[in-house]
Amino acid sequence: MRGALQAVALWGRKAPPHSITAIMITDDQQTIVTGSQEGQLCLWSLSPELKISAKELLFGHSASVTCLARARDFSKQPYVVSAAENGEMCMWNVSSGQCVEKTSLPYRHTAICYYHCSFRMTGEGWLLCCGEYQDVLVLDAGTLAVLHTFTSLQSPDWMKCMCIVHSVRIQEDSLLVVSITGELKVWDLSSSINSIQEKQDVHEKESKFLDSFNCQTIRFCPYTERLLLVVFSKCWKIYDYCDFSLLWTEVSRDGQFFAGGEVLAAHRILVWTEDGHSYIYQLLNRWAQMGATLRTFSGLSKCVCPADGGVLKGTVYPHLLCSTSVEENKSLHFVMGYMNERKEPFYKVLFSGEVSGRITLWHIPDVPISKFDGSPREIPITTTWTLQDNFDKHQMVSQSITDHFSGSRDEVGMTATITSSEYIPNLDKLICGCEDGTIFITKALNAAKAGLLEGDSLLKDSPCHTLLRGHHQSVTSLLYPHNLASKLDQSWMVSGDRGSYVILWDIFTEEILHTFFLEAGPVTRLLMSPENLKRSDGQILCCVCGDHSVALLHLEGRRCLLRARKHLFPVRMIRWHPVENFLIVGCTDDSVYIWEIETGTLERHETGERARIILNCGDDAQLIRSEPTLSVASETHKHKSIEQKSSNSHQPGPVPCPSVQLESSCKVADASSVPRPFNVLPVKTKWSHIGFHVLLFDLENLVELLLPTPLSDVDPSGSFYGGDILRRAKSTVEKKTLTIRRNKASCSSLQTEAQAKPSGDSLVLGDSTSKFSEENNGIKRQKKMKSSKKAHPKPPRKVDASLTIDMAKLFLSCILPWGVDKDLDSLCTRHLSILKLQGPVSLGLASNEDLFSLMLPGWDACSTEMKEYSGVNLCSRKVLDLSSKYTATLLHQTGIPRGLESHCDSVQQSDAIVYLLSRLFLVNKLVNMPLDLACEIDRPFKMETVHSKARFPGSDILNISSFYGHPKNGGNECRAPEADLSLLKLISCWRDQSVQVTEAIQAVLLAEVQQHMKSLRNTPVSSQPDPVAEHSICERMQISAKMEWTEELELQYVGKSSPLKTSVSPVKHGNDLNSANFQDTEDILDRCVLEESESAGQPRHRPWIAKVCSCRMC
């Protein structure tokens, strides 16, 4: 399990499109939530003065959003649920912008209602859903799992709209639903709770045809408990809820189509149309003589009619009071809603969202009245706003990553439209294909710094970039093959365009090596075959085209191997048969085409259950995402799906289909020997355009690369308790075993990262885990390596130290709250060489399941508490309070070196940066820790840890000296002092208080930087010889062990293993394993010594020395 990745959005000057398809206002009336055709949700701040400002974009859906609804009692949990056309459902915390639950169901919802009866049901309540399927689904509001179905006895059909009726008089709840054929159905919710819990059928209690089609809205009048408003496309009707008798019908005029309505008050309704017009009616002559007194009243059963058997003698007559003013644009489609439950100042608000992305608010008066002559009064627009308004007002901070490169500008001077993008981590190169066919290559880190930081005038004036010209149409796809095929040339790059041309480039010499013409549609995807494909001539390139065809190209041989053109539907998935050399193509209609690569013939075509079995077996699937709604993180998995899926093959157990087993798993990652702490992801907001880029920072990888000792070389078995060197040597095998277990578990979690961590950085990932080999034309597992076999030496990590430090400095520049303390800003710039931001940046988080949340420019425009901090890089006012509390706890800590000299060198700067990053990494881990595991960690707070010898799950985190300082007095045991416990308890309290990860990181960074710079503010410098450099070795090594233990602890939680027993001493473990693997231990020790840097004038890092020696120099 890995924490969330820190993200920084480089928006550019143009806002991403946000075609609104659903809109709602939260119950606290502070946030507007909109769903879009592009699949994103947008959170808009709503001030008490009804001012709007876009706050945050949420990425979680890969299809258009169809409906929104609240998913909890909002006063307790601010949760909103969203549904998409492809069946995806997400539950969002609108306060933090994080997705708390996600599922995918084979249903397309058009309406969702939240229902919870506190005194009759347990759990979080129900989500009642209807849509393009029969009847009504009942979902668990906590897990989004299907609980039951409300079924129809008469005329089952698709349901179009619904509402929940709460009857105060009889204390009963009912569900009213109207089908697409105009049939009204009533279910009793109160009496169905027990039936649903017992899984019994629940049928409707009443039904009635309403003699109209295409119902848009049904609303119950809670003020009279008698009126029922039903809005159809061409008319709206008023019914008596008692017996569903028709009271009035109003037909649309001038070709307008009604889209919805609400009940404003007793006998007053609001109806709106598809083009954004709305009308307020007063219902006159509301009730005539009723005849005999009603003997019964139920919201579910019909009332008793008068004795003569007649119907209601009176009807209602609507009188038009008011209408709303609308900017005339009949080509746009509006989605509208109404909110009349605002707290003080008790506004009644009509709101609308347009396809253009504009939100409009009208303040509805409490008592609408017409003019003196009886004509309707016009209600003016109160507020209107778009995403682009945010960008225009705060354009200074919305720099695109390509704004400073002249090669990306057309003849008019405007920035060229980017249609495809690819980042090469090994070379730190960003490759962008443009609509005019040009491709430019630049240094990604330099481009990001030029767009975000001050003081890079030289870079902005003369940026270093390369232009490639060879395409005559829009470049639609890019691929760097060496990332996926380690045997291919590092200089190769492949691009495809809309004209079905594929060009093989040499990016170093800027030459065209070969041009392929596929004679098909636009090239939409470029994929590499897995390395286990049994071909003597190497790996092949797969091209997916817009006309549903697939082509296979051999890059080294410069020839086309296969053109598959018989697919009737778009290609959804590509699979490879590693033994028989088959290409398996899955289409969106769930059909499968199996092609023989050698001959180019169609082997067979399967549909139905057989096709699903073929698609579901094996682990080498490459998903082809749909272009129009591309989530941010999908680009990460586009090329990495092989290594992520195949990591599951490390797990023991049978494989579903032996014919398509995968031989190797993580070989793809061998092409990159450096972890990816920094990544650049393109976001396609339209089907053919890259809207913006997102910078991703992986704190764990960043800290790992900056440490002098790899994590796998550090003993994670707990602590730096002194002992003798022989025992440390004997326990080396134990360290190896623990690392194996961690890495095997980590393989399955690689998909949670924006970029998978390469296996070259792990000591035993590629050598000691289960391997595969081909025997008798099949693929079987080999057993683990015998202890008698020598382990292959780990290749040295090829890390550009200066590049990694630049990544760390860029991250700190983006996170640091610039502007809070100007003196602190200048000290950071001067002594840490961290450049100041040009303005506040848009921060965000990338979670584990393709879920992103990104702040928008000017997100704090409506925040009253942030007005005094305008222009400050603060994610919230809460950061300052958290930082003060952290500083108060920090002052009681001893043993941790803080403070810089006035003339510090680059080594001291690097050590300070590593220390700051390690702190942020630990805070990120603690705040993101699951609640169950956090409870185990919090348990030692309530016990006497000084005299207790028991080991609790999670209590090891208290004994890691990297977080709390060094072992005191050189003792064998490092106990956390009370001040350190209070620090950990403080961060744990932040998690319980729903503090966001970004807020916690900013607060800790601000407090730590203030402590580091404290010595520079005062003229006298402390004479204590305690510089950072003296402690850097020990401290870094201890940070390594802390990271190891955090991962080990989380893996035990994820794997749901048995509770940890009392830890066994290293002596016993070492003796148990040493009997079989002592020779292997000696090899590792010898190799570790040989691999150490022997440069003159530089100290050689010996992690084991720090464990035996108590002096600070070691």
Curated annotation (Swiss-Prot):
Entry GO terms, CC: endosome; nucleus
Coiled coil: none
Keywords: Biomineralization, Cytoplasmic vesicle, Phosphoprotein, Repeat, WD repeat
Xref: SUPFAM superfamilies: WD40 repeat-like, YVTN repeat-like/Quinoprotein amine dehydrogenase
Pfam families reported for this sequence: WD40, WDR72_alpha-sol
Composition skew (Basic residues), residue ranges: 780-796
Intervals holding WD repeats: 15-54, 60-102, 160-197, 327-373, 413-452, 470-515, 566-605
Subcellular location: Cytoplasmic vesicle
Gene ablation phenotype (knockout): Viable with no gross morpholgical defects. At 6-7 weeks of age teeth have an opaque, chalky appearance, with reduced enamel thickness at occlusal surfaces. Body weight is reduced, probably due to problems with chewing hard foods. Enamel formation is abnormal from the maturation stage onwards with significantly reduced mineral density and retention of proteinaceous material in the enamel matrix. Tooth enamel hardness is ten times lower than wild type. Attachment of ameloblasts to the enamel layer may be weakened.
Gene Ontology BP terms: ameloblast differentiation; amelogenesis; enamel mineralization; endocytosis; extracellular matrix disassembly; extracellular matrix organization; gene expression; microtubule polymerization
Phosphoserine modified-residue sites: S1093, S1095
Tissue occurrence: Expressed in maturation stage ameloblasts (at protein level).
Region (Disordered): 634-658, 749-798
PANTHER family xref list: RABCONNECTIN-3B, ISOFORM A, WD REPEAT-CONTAINING PROTEIN 72
Function: Plays a major role in formation of tooth enamel. Specifically required during the maturation phase of amelogenesis for normal formation of the enamel matrix and clearance of enamel proteins. May be involved in localization of the calcium transporter SLC24A4 to the ameloblast cell membrane.
Name listed for the protein in its UniProt record: WD repeat-containing protein 72
Organism the protein comes from: Mus musculus
Lineage start: Eukaryota, Metazoa, Chordata, Craniata, Vertebrata
